[in-house]
């Protein structure tokens, strides 16, 4: 049955290898079980329900990817967009979390339609690669600022906007320790480095009496506080257009990059560089994002951590199915997730931020018409506390720099149209 469903022999793999790969992938991305409730919980959402929604969204998404596309790629609520959901859409812009979930659903529906009608290729190819790298780096810097704030390492300062936190308190010190530990474990190629870092810091905090111990295993909490609580009509407000756009474009670029990157490592690319069943994979991803918003979590997306499972030998969707099963098993570990303090998840955020900024190394810094938009894009996200603003500033700056330099041939209609729309949005409809 498994052979017929996943074509194991054709992919030169077996059940044992796929199970090992699935466990490896799960361990490298299981940190989301602790981080996602911590971030989304700041909106006022029930953390227990978020934990269940995170587990179910990851399980459903990974299963869909395995069954529909037969790829060894796992899904879960994405880092970056969960922070954008909480800190920008809800806390900064003042929308309710129900409206934010509605925006996630709408963006996922648009993603689904783009995947079905194959418009995705046109959109992705219209956006210059340096700008895509800048968007990823900007999200990384956005996450870094949030991580430092949650760790207590960066605090408000009326004179200088921000300042250094109290390094004599245990929270910031443990956060620094956690970050160093994660980096060291990752450098030594230890599987599950991020999750180990979170758990070690939590254990030390419990031992010092800084954090109360809430237990490890119990029956799953109720999903009722977030299930089907999204407000789609509220998300159709004109002030939410840029938010929906940000959710859509970041998910689109992130998924495309992840799918291609992991597929290359798995040897799934065709000789002409084409990724077979890309459409199926994106349909699975968008369907998972829609399902996640119904359950009560931010955008569900493909995880680059799937590459660790590929390195362990994963080649088919059976790897993703194993990950799905482990996320369902994780439903019974809600008390452990509730015990983890913010300063223990902050190192994970900071580490992910480091990974996301790596794309800046590929930028042609000698071309000022490329370097300027990239820097503006990356800086605008943390400094305006908005991924949407960063994307808007990036598009506008890229178009302006190229046009004013007389390099019109490096522009395309989609880029120009989007830049004009962003100018209109920022000038007349900025929320």
What is the meaning of each model-derived region?
Residues 2-36, 57, 78-136, 264-360:
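Helix-loop-helix junctions within the multi-pass membrane cores of secondary transporters/permeases
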Residues 1-49, 162-165, 195-279, 420-424:
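Helix-loop-helix hairpins and the membrane-proximal interhelical loops
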Residues 93-207, 321-431:
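Membrane-embedded alpha-helical modules
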Residues 23-30, 60-63, 67, 148, ...:
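Hydrophobic/aromatic residues within the transmembrane alpha-helices of Major Facilitator Superfamily
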Residues 44-63:
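Loop-to-helix transition at the N-terminal end of transmembrane alpha-helices
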Residues 38-50, 88-99, 238-241, 341, ...:
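Helix-coil boundary and interhelical linker segments in multi-pass alpha-helical membrane proteins
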Residues 58-79, 110:
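Juxtamembrane transmembrane-helix boundary signature
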